Amino acid sequence: MVLIKRHFLQKAAIKVMVDEYLAKQFYNAEYAGVEIVKTPIGTRVIIYAGRPPLIIGKGGKTIKQLAQVLEKFFGLENPQITVTAAENPELNARVMAFRLAIALEKGYHFRRAAFITIRRIMSSGAVGAEVIVSGKLTSERAKYEKLKEGTVYKSGQQLEKIIDRAIGIAMLKPGVYGVEVVITKPTRSIDKIELKEKVEKTEQGGMVTVTNVSFIEENKSSGGVSNASGS
């Protein structure tokens, strides 16, 4: 049992290290995440990014170099790398954090860049979005500014399911700017309720209005949405 636990911990640690390495190397390619799957002939590595060509490189040169690094330094056996476009990049916090960092490095004003980031996220259907930019923004003294739109949950059971959070770093002449992007995904949260009214007859022949409250909950078995109703 101890050996099994150690095996899974090592796999998780390797994935975290690979993820951090790829995020550092390919943030300009809007790196979004990685999947590592062990196969009978080696290791399948699927990289998601907003701009896949920057990771692939000319003639696949960058991919070949990356495969050597993953095998030599991270112990991945015969890595087969696939680079694919991130699905809904505007709803991926890591992609948007890297985009914001790149915009700041190009000279965009932090407030304008953060506002554009918020608008793009909300235009893609997000329930809420929050952007925090910190550093020497307007003076020699470090501070931060926060922009928020919609609903952004800070705690609760559903936090890991509907909240995506990421950070990025922009290197500027005044110093290092830190950016944080938080996105509430376009899914129903467990605190949503629906009120349904219906008219029923009483024993005396009168009419009464009954309100049913439906709590919208996540169906864990099917991954869908189910209603648990009570009066």
UniProtKB/Swiss-Prot annotation:
Name of encoding gene: rps3
Protein name: Small ribosomal subunit protein uS3
rRNA-binding recorded as keyword: yes
Cross-referenced CDD domains: KH-II_30S_S3_arch
Organism: Sulfolobus acidocaldarius (strain ATCC 33909 / DSM 639 / JCM 8929 / NBRC 15157 / NCIMB 11770)
GO function terms (MF aspect): rRNA binding; structural constituent of ribosome
Pfam family, one: Ribosomal_S3_C
Superkingdom in the source lineage: Archaea
InterPro entries: KH_dom (IPR004087), KH_dom-like_a/b (IPR015946), KH_dom_type_2 (IPR004044), KH_sf_prok-type (IPR009019), Ribosomal_S3_C_sf (IPR036419), Ribosomal_uS3_arc (IPR027488), Ribosomal_uS3_C (IPR001351), Ribosomal_uS3_CS (IPR018280)
Phylogenetic lineage: Archaea, Thermoproteota, Thermoprotei, Sulfolobales, Sulfolobaceae
Assembly, per entry: Part of the 30S ribosomal subunit.
